[in-house]
């Protein structure tokens, strides 16, 4: 279908991130290339609050310990309290345009001293930070001869994968979970070279040893966290990996070309209608929606784009007037029960919200001109 349902307009710069608050489905955060964040109330489709969170492009919005987390090209990660005052600021490396990943109380980022490598941090509820892994070289791990799977290698030689371009955490039932690591997810890392590497993070539990016969005389031994290689694919080489998504717990990747790879066994290669795959979103776990740099959005046989006011007649002039797509995500349906009056009585505000209840998912697309369009799917 992909028909326009509504438009959100308040950003004056290119939209770079859209995030539905998992704590409150009608609460939406959007960010732009100037570092501005807008908090929307989707029941009235109006901003509730906006603030200058960063001084450069915002690359990631997430939550940790029930608090909002943001990450920017201004080399900072910030955590915000309920009034959106910054309560923790972490310096980070933002030489590339990679996102960061948050899983439980862990933060996975490009390494602070090398954009090719990884750091892992643990953030406690009292906001104490522990660095578990420092400057981890993924390329060296892959080239130890421990490669689980390498597909599509072009045979070209280089001594690194280049900078990290994109990261994605995918929960999976195939990962070996033990009492040592308690891990049921794979961290996929897409690189400038076109390589994609899947890593399992091992977090050994501390061991308690009795150094004497006295049960009260014990020594606590903390073992180091480590990565284990689970997957390597180089089908995209030499084109940088631009986006990572999932299809029913299977990785899906896109690059600067028109090639999309579904990383099943064996892999499936799809040739798309356009090059420059900006975004791939998973709809209901079994369907994919594709967004391209040139502004087109493709869902099955349906392809749409948004045009600016027409000023020219030639094809070249028309292409320049297409809105450039910058971000895309699914807005999940809300729970009707959250909109009921606590007294059980009908109120106008509750009825108004009920009319705008998200009874089905919407596709949210952010554009270079600062607009955000919601599409029926």
From Swiss-Prot:
Cell compartment(s), UniProt: Nucleus
Gene label: ASA1
Keyword Amino-acid biosynthesis: no
GO cellular component: nucleus
InterPro entries: WD40/YVTN_repeat-like_dom_sf, WD40_repeat_dom_sf, WD40_rpt
Subunit structure: Component of the ASTRA chromatin remodeling machinery complex.
Identification of the protein by name: ASTRA-associated protein 1
WD-type repeats, residues: 10-50, 53-91, 230-262, 263-303, 342-377
């Amino acid at each position: 279908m992909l028909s326009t349902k509504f438009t959100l307009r308040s950003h004056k710069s290119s939209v770079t991130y859209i995030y539905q608050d998992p704590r409150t489905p009608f609460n939406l955060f959007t960010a732009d290339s100037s570092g501005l964040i807008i908090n929307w109330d989707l029941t009235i489709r109006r901003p509730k609050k906006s603030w200058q969170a960063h001084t450069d492009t915002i690359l990631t919005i997430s939550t940790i310990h029930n608090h909002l987390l943001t990450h920017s090209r201004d080399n900072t990660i910030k955590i915000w309290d309920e009034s959106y005052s910054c309560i923790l600021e972490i310096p980070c490396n933002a030489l590339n345009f990679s996102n960061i990943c948050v899983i439980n109380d862990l933060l996975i980022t490009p390494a602070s001293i090398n954009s090719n490598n990884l750091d892992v941090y643990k953030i406690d509820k009292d906001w104490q930070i522990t660095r578990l892994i420092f400057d981890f070289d993924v390329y060296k791990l892959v080239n130890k001869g421990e490669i689980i799977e390498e597909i599509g290698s072009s045979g070209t030689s280089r001594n690194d994968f280049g900078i990290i371009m994109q990261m994605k955490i995918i929960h999976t039932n195939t990962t070996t979970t033990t009492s040592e690591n308690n891990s049921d997810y794979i961290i996929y890392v897409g690189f400038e070279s076109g390589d994609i590497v899947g890593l399992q993070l091992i977090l050994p539990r501390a061991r308690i040893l009795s150094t004497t016969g006295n049960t009260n005389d014990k020594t606590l031994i903390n073992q180091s966290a480590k990565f284990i290689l689970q997957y390597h694919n180089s089908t995209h080489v030499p084109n940088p990996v631009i986006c990572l998504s999932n299809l029913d717990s299977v990785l899906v990747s896109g690059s600067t070309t028109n090639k999309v790879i579904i990383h099943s066994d064996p892999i499936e290669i799809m040739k798309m209608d356009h090059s420059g795959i900006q975004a791939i979103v998973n709809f209901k776990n079994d369907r994919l929606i594709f967004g391209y740099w040139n502004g087109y959005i493709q869902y099955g046989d349906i392809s749409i784009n948004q045009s600016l006011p027409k000023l020219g007649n030639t094809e070249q002039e028309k292409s320049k007037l297409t809105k450039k797509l910058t971000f895309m995500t699914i807005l999940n349906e809300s729970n009707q029960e959250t909109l009921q009056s606590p007294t059980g009585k009908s109120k106008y505000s509750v009825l108004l919200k009920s009319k705008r209840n998200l009874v089905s998912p919407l596709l949210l697309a952010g554009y270079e001109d600062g607009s955000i369009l919601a599409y029926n799917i």
